[in-house]
Structure formats: structure tokens, C-alpha cells
Amino acid sequence: MEHSPEEGASPEPSGQPPATDSTRDGGSGVPPAGPGAASEALAVLTSFGRRLLVLVPVYLAGAAGLSVGFVLFGLALYLGWRRVRDGKERSLRAARQLLDDEERITAETLYMSHRELPAWVSFPDVEKAEWLNKIVAQVWPFLGQYMEKLLAETVAPAVRGANPHLQTFTFTRVELGEKPLRIIGVKVHPSQRKDQILLDLNVSYVGDVQIDVEVKKYFCKAGVKGMQLHGVLRVILEPLTGDLPIVGAVSMFFIKRPTLDINWTGMTNLLDIPGLSSLSDTMIMDSIAAFLVLPNRLLVPLVPDLQDVAQLRSPLPRGIIRIHLLAARGLSSKDKYVKGLIEGKSDPYALVRVGTQTFCSRVIDEELNPHWGETYEVIVHEVPGQEIEVEVFDKDPDKDDFLGRMKLDVGKVLQAGVLDNWYPLQGGQGQVHLRLEWLSLLPDAEKLDQVLQWNRGITSRPEPPSAAILVVYLDRAQDLPLKKGNKEPNPMVQLSVQDVTRESKATYSTNSPVWEEAFRFFLQDPRSQELDVQVKDDSRALTLGALTLPLARLLTASELTLDQWFQLSSSGPNSRLYMKLVMRILYLDYSEIRFPTVPGAQDWDRESLETGSSVDAPPRPYHTTPNSHFGTENVLRIHVLEAQDLIAKDRFLGGLVKGKSDPYVKLKVAGKSFRTHVVREDLNPRWNEVFEVIVTSIPGQELEIEVFDKDLDKDDFLGRYKVSLTTVLNSGFLDEWLTLEDVPSGRLHLRLERLTPRPTAAELEEVLQVNSLIQTQKSSELAAALLSVFLERAEDLPLRKGTKPPSPYATITVGETSHKTKTVSQSSAPVWEESASFLIRKPHAESLELQVRGEGTGTLGSVSLPLSELLQEDQLCLDHWFALSGQGQVLMRAQLGILVSQHSGVEAHSHSYSHSHSSSSLNDEPEALGGPTHPASPVLEVRHRLTHGDSPSEAPVGPLGQVKLTVWYHSDEQKLISIIHSCRALRQNGRDLPDPYVSVLLLPDKNRSTKRKTPQKKRTLNPEFNERFEWDLPLDGTLRRKLDVSVKSNSSFMSRERELLGKVQLDLAEIDLSQGAAQWYDLMDDRDKGGS
């Protein structure tokens, strides 16, 4: 404890006169100013100087003309810093007092507020280890001497060499203090292995450490004065051998992130500002976690030539837990309205944590009984020790409200195999429903087919279920190529499986690096996936070698393991990489758990499955039984092109002056209505709009067409026409000028086309490309597929209040289109037998969402089916039971059909589909419906625009990459059209990937009227744009121009400068604008801008 000078002064010896009496000035009678008076005056001046210094910012703000807001902001910043600082000092003092005298402090603070005690204070059921603390206390001063040498002789030179601005960096003070690290208790776990000892050490460090640094060149001082660190450190002694020192190695790591609190000094005092304080502590903890928190660990070998060091440093996981976050119920309401007078609900979401693995669910708005239906897979490294933690929050604009948490030791999941329970939330109210499955790691591929078949029936969100795990032990490389100028590279490795990429650390100035790192990947289907390895310089611009390894190769290897050298391609002749690849199949052992009767239905607990069962109940069907009309729908594509000789309805000056009309078209077909835009003052309008509608082959249907003149009061009638759908569906195509009825004059140009869905995905990419070509600006995006859904029934739906069956109905939604089924009264096994069809524009990106709800009871369960899964199935169809989130299953059939137009070019290049699948041929000439057949317009000439030269492997890519363009001239609309499809193999300058976009100019004009630009794509060398641009130009004017296409990237976040990645310039006079074929063009630099 520090003392004032008065408290520490020694008393005067008795018998001596006071010093003040012998030093008085006899002439004046006033005592001279002694040391005490001088120090008191200095203290007064110091206090006055501090107050004056506080007023300096206020004066400067006023002199600069700044508002009082800046002064208030600075004051708030200071008060926040002071509050954080005082809190840290108070916590440090309380912790030190507790360590100094545990019994007395515990008794005195029995009723102390929890805010006054450190968060780590607890009394774990572990053994005391005071003897160990005495050893640490004895060693502590010598450890301080070692740290001082380490920082001064190793760390300081490294810092000075890292940056020229830190040439004067030095440690001015290094003291670990007098408070050593304490071990509160030790717990020894029984290990399943005989050659291993597991220890858990509850460590607590409340130290008076002081480390000061200085950069003399900039008069900058900073440091640390006091620190707290508390956590559970696991120590593993393995392998135990029969030779001294008995223990082969010691592994140490924190099972969970320890708590950290640092008291800063000097310039680092700024880190105590609110916001910066949490950010700095988080960054420091991230650094600690990078090498000392699971799955990372510190390995200290105790014997030379220890075998399987990589396996000890990064052992295989104990298992995988598949966490199904299903639902919650009875949550507390946190949203209040009208200043708390009206109680609302909550917008709950959940955070799931296992060690450093964290997952966040989606937010369910306005719901106290949310259903998430999400699945996560976590790696379990240590049992016992790791915990599953679920925290539920209410999403708010400012700060999210805490609704409760639950914790569960992963050892209980290991023992049970499967746990499906409602768990109460601590610190709040309500329960959360979790289904936890322990997946064992099998060292052979015998059960892989069974696992894959099971996973196909699991509806998992947000990621599909995994069938295997791959662990890559990256050891070292040899004889990598040198950089330019024979400089040693700084190699690092990028490992990728599908869309997941991991990066190793960089090793500097060597062409034979040693990494000794481990990486883990989840695999959905190891038979078809690959491991892509890229060895690069740390700038990421220079590739030192590459390797692509099909993972199917491991399936035939012994114990699914490859431990060998791999030769690198695109590298030196002797360049190679040493790795150990270990694959394990994820298997859920159902030997004691009942299988679901149909793949796709999750296994619910036996009691709930047997409730209400009957011996005489009929067997549950495996597949749906739709009626004969299901899946026979077609799509009618309606092109409303133009009209001629419409009658004039507008009159001016009381009818004396004859004007024109403002025409638009209304369409009615199959219960749907459509309307074109209005063309102002034109008797020969051009609309060029496309509409699509799902139609059936029921006879007697008609397409009703009416033309009106738009007016302020009542729209005037300009004519009508009716087309029989039977005729269009039989012929497949109609392109006619239709004479309008009930009016003196006028005719309408209409093009109708029947699109029959095809159950093959081979033509999907071509369909998407053709749709982008014939797309018009005033029409919505064209459909590429038709989705047909048949919902037959549901089973095992949850009961209301635990006893009463619900009255369920289902809602099927795709995009913005929904279909609601009938409501079945009071049944937990409803039968709907309803179908619905949806137009699909982007099959790769859209999904089918099904919700089962009860009248007055809310959501009973839901299913999300990405349509990309249908594209991978035979006949593009799934027909089985789907598990609902929460409880229950539905029997549903979902089938996709690709909409191939024979009159837009796909058919000319399609060889993978037999015409026998179509109900009728579309190759016949269309029959006239009221007039001679009109010649096909240039829109139909798209049929020969798709070429097979589109393949990326057709020609080598240039050094700057390529851009894929379609350029053609629409003679009907007199427009130049360009589609920017994508880029590939763009160059990378610097460490970060570019953020590319494409800028298009129509030279010689460089103004804004001809400039077009795509959206920016983030961090990619192979961006996909699919953007369409148009210019209104006559054909002769188009042929005199050049199309300048530039691929650019933002240079930095703060800069407006744009980096040119490459460009190409196309002379439109030299291009066949009637073909419009998509083509790859090599990008050039600014000096050479020619086309490919």
C-alpha cells in the first residue's frame, strides 16, 4: 500500500529541540519557506495548471468557430474513458484483495454487489493446489528475468526491423510484479486412453505487471500497468512411454476463451475510450485464441524425435454434433409501445456456441413461440469440457434484449447418441427445443452410401448436411520457384473445397517453408468434391504452385488417409508439397434408435411416435399419388408488339380539333389480367412487352384482348379480339396481325408461344442466356422453368395445448407468389391433395417455402427446399416425406420443368433431349388466324445466336483475363443491345482481390448519355454480371461507332480512383450484329485495346 510522506516519516527523537525553533529568523519573526511550503505551493500550481489545461480545448473550439457540440462530445468522451478506467481499477483492487486474504474478503463482501466482484470469482468443486502456487511464487522472479531478456533481445529488434518508423522502439521497463499467477484448483479427468492424462487448471492472474515501451523519435510512450486473466487451462500429458521422462509431450490450451482485463498507460490510455476498449480487448483475445484456445493448442515435446507431432498438435476431433435448432416457446415479451402502456411481443433469434464456433439463426418477427428449423454442425475436440450454449435475444434497432440461455455438456450428447428435448432458459423465461445428434467418425467408406441416402432426405438450413469431414495437415514444401530477381518468396497456402477456403500463415524469405498447420472441411459428397491447393507468395499475386486432388482418391486409401509428398503443377520441376489428408465418414449410429419409416422424415422420440397409434392403421405411403392432370400445365408467352391505324379519341377545343389517342392493351387469360404501359399520343404505338401465364389444356379457354385510350375520366374503347387457346396450344406458335373488332379501324401485332416444361437441366444455361437476349426493358424477367408442387398430406403435427389436435392448413410460397390450401378441421394428420404451379426465373437461386399453420395456433412447422436440389435430381423431381421444423412431416412432390423456346434458338443446338417427351411437335408452320402469316421478326432470329464456342476451355485465357459479351442490333426497335455476361481470370494487383465492375462507352461519344455501368462485385476474379444495356440508334449510326468495354476496380475504400484491370474495344462495323452470339474477348491494357 502506498503511504503519504507524513505517514512514512520517522518520529523525532525525544530530548532534542524541534528543528523549527533553531532555524527561525530572529529579526523578522516569520519562519522561512521550508520544503513543506514549497511542495504545497507546487501542488497548488499543478492543480491550477490542470484546470487551465482543461479550458484550453474550450478556448480553441471557440477560436476556431466550432459549435458547442464539439465541446460536449469531447466531454462525453472523457467521462466515458474515466468510467471505464475507474471500473478497471476497482475490479483490479477487488481481485487483489480477494487473493491477498480470501477468507476475510469473502466474509466482508458477502452482501457486496456483484458489480464490485470480479466475474471469475467462484468456488469450483476441484482440489486445492497451494503447494503448486508456492512453487510458482518461487519461480516468478526468475520468469520475470527471462521475460525481460526475451522482450529486449528478441522482440524489440524484430519490431524495429518490421517498420522503418519504429527504429527507436525500445522496452524501457519490464516487470512481472510481485503478484504471481495463481492456480485456484486442479481437476483430473478419467481418460478413455491409457497413455493420456487430462488435467484442468483453474488459473487466475491478477498481476501488478508493468511493461513500458517508447518510440523516442516520436516522443511516444505507452504501456501496461496491471492485468487480469482468468480461465480454465487444460493440460494433456501424452503419450505416456516406458522411457524417461515417461511423458512424451505436454499440450496446453484454454477450452473456452479466458476473460481478460488490461490497465493501459501512456498513449494506450486511449484504448480505454468506450468502443475502443471492447475492440482492443477483442483483438487481443483473438490473438491469444489463435494459438491457445481450442482448436489451437500449445505443444511442448519432452523427448526428441517424437512421432506424430502433427497429430498431437492438431488431433482428430472426437466427433461431430449436429444441432437442430427447432423452436422456442413461452419467451418473454420485450417490445413495448406507447411508453410501455401496451405490451408487444419479441423478435427472437438465437446464438449457438460450441467453443469458438458460433452460429446465428434468422430473426422471427413478432413471435413469442418462434420456429427456426435450422441445422448446424460443430466439431467437438474435447470430451468432457466443451459445452453447447444457446442464447436467445430479442432483435432491436439499438441494443438486443437478452431472453435467456441454456448450457449442456457435450458429454451428455455422446452418452445418449440423440437428445430431443425442450430445455429451460436460464436468466429469462421459456424453453428452447433442440435435437442433438452425435456423429461418430468412421475410418472406412463402407457406410458412405447409407449416409448419403439418409442426408438426401434431410431438409437442412442454412447448409446441407455433411457426409464426411476432411482434415488436412499441411506440413511443408520444397524447392518452390523464386521470385523475380532470384529473391526468396514468402509462401502461404490457400486450400479450397467447393466454396470454403482456408489460408495458412506466411513463412518469410524461404523456398522450403514449414507450416505445420491443420485445416478442417465439411464434405457433402466426397465422391464428387475436390481439394484445390494454391501455393502463393504472401501478396497473393504470384502463384508458386498448384494442386487439385479428387477426394474420391481417399475413399480407396487405407483408413481414408494419404500421408505423402504431392508434386505441384505450374511450379518448378522439383517443387512438391507434403501433406497428410485424413477423411472420416460422419455416421449416426441408429442401432438403438428407431429409423424413420421413410427417408427424409427425422427420427422423433419413441413416445411421441407411438402416441395414438393403432394396430389396424394403414401403412404410410412412400410417395404421393397426384391426379392425371398434375404436371400437364404449359406456359403461354404473350408478346404484345405494336398496333396500327388505331382510331383517334382525343378532341380539343370542344371537339373542333381532332387529336390522337394514348393507347394501352389489356389482356385476360386463365383468370389472370395483364396491362401494357400507355404510349402517349400515338395511333401506331409500339409496346414490345412480354407477359407469361400458366395455362392448362381445358377446352373453351380464350385470350381476351382489349385496346383502350387512356383518359382522365373514363378510358375510351379502341377495339377487341379473342384468340382460342386451344388453337395456340395445338400449333405451339402464333405470330399475327389481328384486326380489331367493334371499331372502324385498327389492328394489333401479337406473338403467342407455348412453352412445354422439359424434365432436364441440360438446356437451362442456354435458356437463361436466350431470355436475357429477348428480354425487353418494360417487361419483367422471363421465366426459365415451371415448378409444379403436389401437397398430399401431413402427419404427427403438434397438438394444441398438448391434447387437442390443430386445424391445419398449408401455405406454399415461391418468391412473391403463394398458394394456400384448404383448412382441415381438428386433425394432426390432415389430407389436402392440392397442387400449385409457379413460374421460376432463377432456378439456381430461388427456393420453395412451405409453412403448416393452425387456425388460431400459429406456425406448426415449415420446410425450405432450394430449387437447386431439384436440378441435381433425375427428372428434376423429389417425391417423399419432408421433415417439418419442430415436429411432424409432410408428403410432397416437387418437380421442375425447363421452359425451352423452339423459336428463340435453344432448340437449334439442343441434342440431349428427345422430342418424344413433348405432347405435340412445335415445328409445324403456324396456321393463320385471320390473316396471312407475318414473317418472323428479328427477335426470332435468336435461334442461331448461341454457339458452342462458348466453352471456357476452347481457347487460352489472356494474361489480363477475359470478358464475355453479346452485342447485336434489334432492327424492330432500332436499338443496339449489349449484354455483359461475366469475366474470368482477371488479374490481381496486390494482396486483396479486386471489386470489379464493367464500364461501357459508345465512342466517339464520352458523355453520360451513352455511358453504362454494371453493379460492382465484391472480391472476385470471376464476376457474374448478366446486365443488359440498350442504346436508341439507327443502324447506319451504329455502324459508325465503337464499343469501349473497360473492366475496373475500386482502388481503395477512401479513394475515388478506379484501377483499370483491362479493356477491349469493338468496332461495330466489323461485327455481325444480326447474330448476337455470346463471345469471350481477351482484355488488353490501355495501350492495346483491340478485340479478340
Swiss-Prot record:
Annotated residues for binding of Ca(2+) 2:
335, 347, 394, 396
Q: Which organism is it from?
A: Mus musculus
PANTHER family xrefs: EXTENDED SYNAPTOTAGMIN-1, EXTENDED SYNAPTOTAGMIN-LIKE PROTEIN 2, ISOFORM C
Q: Which residues carry this modification: N6-acetyllysine?
A: 804
Concerning PROSITE patterns, the annotation shows: C2, SMP
Residues reported to bind Ca(2+) 3 = 396, 398, 400
Membrane association type: Multi-pass membrane protein; Peripheral membrane protein
Annotated Ca(2+) 1 binding sites: 334-335, 394, 396, 401
What are its GO biological-process terms? endoplasmic reticulum-plasma membrane tethering; intermembrane lipid transfer
Q: Which UniProt keywords apply?
A: Acetylation, Calcium, Cell membrane, Endoplasmic reticulum, Lipid transport, Lipid-binding, Membrane, Metal-binding, Phosphoprotein, Repeat, Transmembrane, Transmembrane helix, Transport
Task: Enumerate the Cytoplasmic topological stretches.
Answer: 1-28, 74-1092
| Membrane-spanning intervals of the chain | 29-49, 53-73
Which lineage do the record's taxonomy fields give for this organism?
Answer: Eukaryota, Metazoa, Chordata, Craniata, Vertebrata
Q: Where is the composition biased (Low complexity)?
A: 911-921
PTM comment text: Phosphorylated on Ser residues in insulin-treated adipocytes (in vitro); this promotes interaction with SLC2A4.
Positions where N-acetylmethionine occurs in the chain: 1
Q: What's the domain of life for this entry?
A: Eukaryota
A Pfam family reported for this protein in Swiss-Prot or TrEMBL? SMP_LBD
Task: Name the encoding gene, please.
Answer: Esyt1
Give any GO molecular function from the UniProt entry: phospholipid transfer activity
Q: Where is this region: Disordered?
A: 1-36, 604-628, 909-937
Which residues does the record list as Phosphoserine (modified residue)? 314, 807, 937, 951
Q: Does the keyword Mitochondrion apply?
A: no
Query: Where, per UniProt, does this protein localize?
Result: Endoplasmic reticulum membrane; Cell membrane
This protein's name = Extended synaptotagmin-1
